[in-house]
Amino acid sequence: MGSYDKINYLLRPNKSVERKMVCEMLSGISNIRNLSTYIYVGLGSVYFADFMLFHRNLGIKKMVSIESDNKVKERCEFNKPFSCIELKMGDSTSVLPNLNLQDTNSIVWMDYDSAISDTVFSDINTVVSKMTPDSFFMLSLNADTINLKEPLEEDKDIIDPQRKVVEMIGDERFPNHFRDVEMTAKQYLNLLHHCIMTEINTVVQKRNGMNDEKVLFHQTVNFIYLDGIRMLTVGGFLFKQEDAEEHLEKMCTRSLPFYRNSEEVYKIQCPILSLKEIQALNSHLPCIVHDDGKLDDEFLNSFPLSNQEIRKYAALYRYYPNYVETLL
């Protein structure tokens, strides 16, 4: 059973901010391509939050939602917010190979609620080997170190975090320089990022070896956030090698404050604020934040919130979710 039965995907503040940031990044595609011709592939579950956002804001009219749980098929069909969404039943490893990603530009977001596994690597291979230049691929996964405290598959009586992480990633993929490293939360994030990007670049290298058209994958996203559990999101654009610089400039991708092209993460941290606090802060934003953390606004510096909380909000106020209870 997926996490949809435990968490309302529409009510996770940090996830909501992530979706809006990604949407803003994707909007830059319109400077090089017609976004309405793209296909969006995701894991919509029963909420379809990303589908609603991307259809309304990007004008994407062809959308595919992959659902592996047959028990919620009727519920997913009922909850589809738009007729342009096609529900494909099955695991991502069986559905993705049958999508014609080689025939059209695509945006693919594999938003897993599980930890890293062979499925993740299989999907990376399928998508990156097929998708066309100027397409976007991103994946999110559970990056909580609690996963490392699960019993080993080969011996259910043993709990060994070092062996567990090798088991999850696969011995052949596990980088040697991480083998003797204690798996702290930070090291685990670095390991996951390294393995994901290594797999993507390996597929790109194989693809270039078999085709005259040479491509590259340019990472633009490396988010972490916490809505109950720590999640990691890594992604970027596939370009023709000769187009990459020009297209990144036209799309203004690198000017976004949350753009990340390395293992350095962007932490999405929504402070919990009252409606009155939000309204007051908004009336004084945007503002300059100095190197010492001070804000270039007397009102904000005297506001009854910590400087850290105000700076967190100032960094993402344009994406901050608004929740309102209504009686229908």
List the predicted regions and their residue ranges.
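Long alpha-helical, hydrophobic tracts
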Residues: 47, 64-154
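A generic "functional-site adjacency" signal
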Residues: 16, 102-106, 190, 230
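Class I S-adenosyl-L-methionine
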Residues: 3-8, 97, 115-328
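Sequence-level motif detector for i,i+2 pairs with an aromatic at +2
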Residues: 35-38, 103, 134, 231
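N-terminal start-of-chain detector that recognizes signal peptides
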Residues: 35-38, 111, 206-210
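SAM cofactor-binding core of SAM-dependent methyltransferases
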Residues: 2, 6-100, 251, 268-272, ...
